[in-house]
Regions:
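N-terminal "arm"/small-domain region of PLP-dependent enzymes with the aminotransferase-like
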Residues: 1-64
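PLP-dependent aminotransferase-like
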Residues: 7, 89-148
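Phosphate-binding glycine-rich loop
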Residues: 56-97, 115
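Active-site pre-lysine segment of PLP-dependent enzymes
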Residues: 113, 132-141, 154-175, 179-212
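PLP-dependent enzyme catalytic core of the Aspartate aminotransferase-like
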Residues: 162, 309-310, 320-349
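PLP-dependent aminotransferase class I/II
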Residues: 199-277, 284
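Conserved PLP-binding catalytic core of the aspartate aminotransferase-like
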Residues: 265, 278-310
């Protein structure tokens, strides 16, 4: 199977005729082709220049960290841009559809709605796992993409590998797996399987574990065909040179990042155990992320407002399907977690 067969006809034609964005020039040259500012940048860095080979340099470093070849890596301006490109490439408006499994993040449905692509929904079951039979029944010839999050947001759990593999082996379309929180999970990433499954695209980013949320830079891992498609239909400018330079510095501090991940997991365990001891909390769901989904035995709106009154902001998930009476609570510093616990213990009805 080649995913190019799934492309919209007009997109396939664009990809066929479009040359690679990367041009090769001599090391020393006079660049009079890009309309850059001849005086340079008012900043110390050469921000008047285009990215040049910086994206390839970052690809090489990420390749060494993750063990994925550079031609299986793509960088985009956030998960939204990459997902938007994939829906544009594979889904014919008013004809095709995507499939999602709520509760999950909103961007998949939002992108489809904007592009006039129908959305099929199959709810999670049994501790927020996939309803494989329900998905099989919902899929039709117009289903081009299944979007999943593992670990999932807001439920915080990973999807079982066996279920994901069932979909990869039996679904003829594209499976996009958002692994934004995979750094905090015990389950290993699916990037090792991209050679085995040409219909798999994995999304990760530098937002959370890397601490670079402000940059809004994401990575896609997939087959060479998938990466070529993304390269040829994505915006010409792509990720900024300034963002790549910051990412490069962060990569040089990978040991610090890995330590922060370990510390977050430790604090997550502490917070989960302590929350479960509070009498107004019914359940703290197992987490493979940097947040906890917590179900309350009292009206969750009261708990949410009480925390807010005491200067603590959390996410109220009560109106999300299958998350009734739940708050999503990010793991904070030890001091922040202790204050949260102290405030919740003082909440009486």
């Amino acid at each position: 199977m080649t995913i190019k067969n799934l492309l919209r006809k007009n997109i396939a034609a664009i990809i066929e005729k479009k040359q690679s964005k990367k041009s090769i020039y001599p090391i020393r040259n006079i660049r009079l082709d890009s309309n850059e500012n001849l005086f340079g940048s008012p900043l110390a860095a050469n921000y008047h220049q285009q990215n040049g080979d910086l994206s390839f340099s970052i690809s090489e470093k990420i390749s060494r960290i993750k063990g994925v070849p550079t031609n299986n890596i793509f960088f985009g301006n956030g998960n939204y841009e990459i997902c938007n490109a994939l829906v544009s490439a594979f889904c014919e408006p008013r004809m095709d559809n995507i499939l999602i499994c709520p509760p999950t993040i909103e961007i998949f449905e939002q992108i489809a709605d904007i592009q006039g692509v129908a959305v099929k929904k199959v709810l999670l079951i049994n501790d927020y796992q996939l309803d494989i039979e329900g998905i099989a029944e919902a899929i039709d010839e117009g289903t081009k993409i299944i979007f999943l999050c593992s670990p999932n947001n807001p439920t915080a759990n990973t999807i079982t590998r066996e279920d994901i593999e069932i979909l990869l082996n039996n679904f003829d379309g594209l499976l996009v797996l958002d692994e934004t929180y995979i750094n905090y999970a015990r389950q290993r990433s699916f990037w090792y399987e991209i050679k085995e499954y040409p219909n798999l695209v994995i999304l990760q980013n530098f937002d959370i574990a890397w601490g670079l949320y402000a940059l809004n830079v994401a990575m896609a891992f997939g087959s060479e065909n998938a990466i070529e498609i993304l390269q040829k239909i994505s915006p010409e400018r792509g990720v900024s040179k300034a963002s790549f330079e910051i990412i490069e510095r962060a990569i040089d501090n990978i040991d610090q990042i890995n330590q922060w991940i370990k510390d977050t997991v430790m604090l997550r365990g502490f917070l989960a155990r302590e929350l479960q001891q509070i009498n107004i909390i019914r359940k703290v769901y197992p987490s493979e992320t940097n947040f906890l989904l917590v179900r309350f035995s009292i009206d969750v709106n009261i708990a949410h407002d009480y925390l807010l009154k005491n200067g603590i902001v959390v996410k109220n998930c009560h109106n999300e399907i299958l998350c009734e009476n739940c708050l999503r609570i990010s793991v904070g510093t030890l001091q922040e977690n202790e204050k949260l616990l102290k405030v919740l213990k003082t909440l009486t009805l």
